[in-house]
Structure formats: C-alpha cells, structure tokens
Curated annotation (Swiss-Prot):
Family statement: Belongs to the imidazoleglycerol-phosphate dehydratase family.
Main location: cytoplasm
InterPro entries: IGPD_sf, ImidazoleglycerolP_deHydtase, ImidazoleglycerP_deHydtase_CS, Ribosomal_Su5_D2-typ_SF
Organism: Nitrobacter hamburgensis (strain DSM 10229 / NCIMB 13809 / X14)
Identification of the protein by name: Imidazoleglycerol-phosphate dehydratase
NCBIfam families with a match to the protein in the record: PRK00951.1-5 (NF002109), PRK00951.2-1 (NF002111), PRK00951.2-4 (NF002114)
Subcellular location: Cytoplasm
Amino acid sequence: MRTATIKRKTKETDIEVAVNLDGSGVSSVATGIGFFDHMLDLLARHSRIDIMVKADGDLHVDYHHTTEDVGIALGQAVKQALGTMAGITRYACAHMPMDETLSRVVIDISGRPMLVFKVEFPRDKIGEFDTELVREWFNAFAVNAGVTLHVETLYGENSHHIAESCFKGLARALRAAVAIDPRAAGEVPSTKGQLGG
C-alpha cells in the first residue's frame, strides 16, 4: 500500500495529514473552514485517494496559514506515498464541468514542481473563504508534491463552481497519474531512469 502520514507544527498551525493512494476515496477532514473541508472531501472522493486531515490553525487571524499549510502537508504526503514512483502513469489531464463552468487540470508527476494557474474568480469570497487562497493551496500542494500542475478555468461565472471544478479536476488528474500502469513493469516513467531533475 502506498501510504504516508505527515505532521507539521508551527506557531501558526498544527496539522496532521494521512493519505492512501490505493484507497477508495474515504475522507476525514477537519480544518475548521467549512468550504475548504468541502473541497478536500471532493478531492478524496474523486481521486479515490483516502485522505485524513486534522488542522488546528490561527483562524482568528484569517484562513491563509491553515489553507497553505494543509497544501504543504498534503503535497508532502503524496510525494512520500509515491516513493520511487516506479510504474506510475505519471501524466494525466482532466476536463471538469460544474454547471456553467469548465476547468482543465493537467499534471506531470515529474519531480519538478511548478504551478501555472489561469483562474479568475468573479467574487473575492466564497462565503468567508478568500478566493485568492485557492491559488495558494494549489501552489503549496504542487511545490511540495513535486509535480508540474497546470490549472485553467476555460469559462465560468460562479466562484463556488469555479473552485469546485478546479479541485475535482485535480482529483481526476491525480487519480489517473498515480495509477500503476501494468505495462510499465515497475519502471520509472522517464528516459533518464529517474524523476526530479
């Protein structure tokens, strides 16, 4: 089983994250941020990755530290669970509709972290959640997972739908990219013989 647990404690947050890449999409998420919990539940369900997140953050300041630090810890957990990355599919692309919105998420589990994020929100907030934090989370996740990630909303009008289509798109892309390719026979999917450089 490809699993990992990460604990991260700073003066701003205390976070524990666990993942099982070969799970069934079970989630147990408690960050204290309702909308964010919803997005992480969706990520687990549609990626079929079991995700557990417990976060205690300085929400009296704002949601930034908790959101970013969960992205850091979850990215680290995925990277650790991938291990040598032998046999993985590596590349994947997902187009994700959410009513009037369509987003595209493309991933390369390359070991070379990068985020390209072309998403615009018509509103500054979704409930009490700052929409700019969606990018912060994706960046923290991509950098710490060691993946190249392109996220683009092709069109959309509702901020909730836009965010949800991005998280669901990541879920479906991750599901395909971390899957073991039976034809790869345990090989690292790179002509270099290694990923990450």
